[in-house]
Amino acid sequence: MKVAVLGAAGGIGQALALLLKNQLPSGSELSLYDIAPVTPGVAVDLSHIPTAVKIKGFSGEDATPALEGADVVLISAGVARKPGMDRSDLFNVNAGIVKNLVQQIAKTCPKACVGIITNPVNTTVAIAAEVLKKAGVYDKNKLFGVTTLDIIRSNTFVAELKGKLPTEVEVPVIGGHSGVTILPLLSQIPGVSFTEQEAAELTKRIQNAGTEVVEAKAGGGSATLSMGQAAARFGLSLVRALQGEKGVVECAYVEGDGQYARFFSQPLLLGKNGVEERKSIGTLSAFEQHSLDAMLDTLKKDIQLGEDFINK
């Protein structure tokens, strides 16, 4: 099993690479790519960690050597948020980066499962889909927007509020991956209940958690370490499913049947070919239903922006 991390010299990429070097199954290969010349050195640094995961780093304009034979590609390349920016302010730079990298994936490892971490995810996933489609290699079961950070934040905040162990809580999060499009289904957590006010406040905190980190870092970056953890969790789940493990479920932002929007984050059963089944979002509370209805316009506009970037 070969996993490639694109954007591996950045804050998320290095954290993700460290976790994968430690946690990928024995015999796996990990390849790191970034435009930055430090990348081969990041791989050498990680290569000293005593796990049976082979690692190699590549830098420069051409990601091809890192992508050859990859089963899973995780893309974290791009610029990070600074105070006062929202995820959509990143669009102008990151759209071009994602387009370029996905074009290289389409040529070199078109059958790989691709996880997009680069923000704004609502839009960059649509860009990736259109690039793959133009190249004639798009498989909607193999392209994912990684929204796992919203899930792990939800798990943490719910556990804190309700005095639970974070490992005991698993919150499904649907919709998209920015602002109002992030919708934690707090009503579906077994054995935990919330007042209407608690649900509204907690939902808002989860939606704005990225900004909480950006502001706390005072201009020094955005959420890199927790995002590295989230991306590793998703990547490792994908690897386990690709290797035949049954019953692996994660939420991610994928193209579905278009019931809510062309791309939508929902619980997915993962399997040997990527998405095996898009699971139902279940019964929503009145607050959740209202939030879902209210966000769809925003989500659809985000998606349209990505489609237009490639097609216009």
Swiss-Prot record:
Gene3D superfamilies, per database record: Lactate dehydrogenase/glycoside hydrolase, family 4, C-terminal, NAD(P)-binding Rossmann-like Domain
Binding site for substrate: R81, R87, N119, R153
EC numbers for this chain: 1.1.1.37
Effect of T181K: In strain: ZJ-74
Pfam families for this protein: Ldh_1_C (PF02866), Ldh_1_N (PF00056)
Active-site residues from the entry: H177 (proton acceptor)
InterPro entries, per database record: L-lactate/malate_DH, Lactate/malate_DH_C, Lactate/malate_DH_N, Lactate_DH/Glyco_Ohase_4_C, Malate_DH_AS, Malate_DH_type1, Malate_DH_type1_bac, NAD(P)-bd_dom_sf
Descriptive protein name: Malate dehydrogenase
Organism: Salmonella paratyphi A (strain ATCC 9150 / SARB42)
Gene of this entry: mdh
